[in-house]
Amino acid sequence: MRLKGVLALFSFFTAIPIKSNASLEEIAEYSYISPLIIGISLALIESAVYVLLYRILEALAGIVLLGVVELLRGFNHLDGLLDLGDALMIKGDRERKIKALKDVEIGSGGIGLLLVYLSIQIVALLKLGFSFYTIFYLISSNVLSMTIGLYILSTISPIPESNLGKIFHNKLKGKSTVLLFELIPFISLYNIIVFLVFYMIMHKICRSLGGSSGDIAGASITLSFPLFLLTNEITNLNYSLLSILCYLFLYLH
């Protein structure tokens, strides 16, 4: 495994200032490990910031954390969310939907989907609270959301217009099983249901557009994160390997 390709994952998926001259092909080649490397790294940073903010702002720390979450991601996936929202609002043939997906202007569909995301995200972050489990909620949610975006790229053929989608699909199409195995420590019974339902919805959307793309994967990562986080908070990560390890840690100490 080349260090250059691994470090390039940070410059591609986040706003963390790590210089890399890796090509898109090299990034795509190692992207299957990004849920573990990038997902856990982001969760650790978010947890540290949240702890500091909570000491000052208490429950309102979740609102500030929303900005931190998007800032760490460089707002990259938000662009995909806005584009997908515009495409979903288009009535008509596939060509018109793809034009909206590629359009740089933001329409009512993009704004609408953004409001849906912000509403769910704010509720999830306000409910985050402060406990021993907070960091594990964030780790699980980051890993799961990144995995579902990459799993979509690996299992659904890309639209002809998406160069990024083609590159990632070619590099990931043999890695879908690996992506699922990476989930084992972090996914609960309830999140399996969320994962499957979310994937089926995105699969149907991809069919209407003619395939997957970088925008669709980015939108999936963005929109699924608060859903997984909210599920983790409500169910306390029950029936997951991560929760078992937490219980053992607390019991032994």
Swiss-Prot record:
The UniProt record lists the keyword Endoplasmic reticulum: no
Keyword terms of this UniProt record: Cell membrane, Cobalamin biosynthesis, Magnesium, Membrane, Transferase, Transmembrane, Transmembrane helix
GO cellular-component term (any): plasma membrane
Disulfide bonds: none
Listed GO MF terms: adenosylcobinamide-GDP ribazoletransferase activity; cobalamin 5'-phosphate synthase activity
Subcellular location: Cell membrane
GO biological process, one term: cobalamin biosynthetic process
The protein's annotated pathway: Cofactor biosynthesis; adenosylcobalamin biosynthesis; adenosylcobalamin from cob(II)yrinate a,c-diamide: step 7/7
EC number: 2.7.8.26
TM spans (from-to): 33-53, 56-76, 106-126, 132-152, 178-198, 209-229, 233-253
Function, as annotated: Joins adenosylcobinamide-GDP and alpha-ribazole to generate adenosylcobalamin (Ado-cobalamin). Also synthesizes adenosylcobalamin 5'-phosphate from adenosylcobinamide-GDP and alpha-ribazole 5'-phosphate.
UniProt family annotation: Belongs to the CobS family.
Name the UniProt record assigns to this protein: Adenosylcobinamide-GDP ribazoletransferase
Species whose genome carries this gene: Saccharolobus islandicus (strain M.14.25 / Kamchatka #1) (Sulfolobus islandicus)
Gene designation: cobS
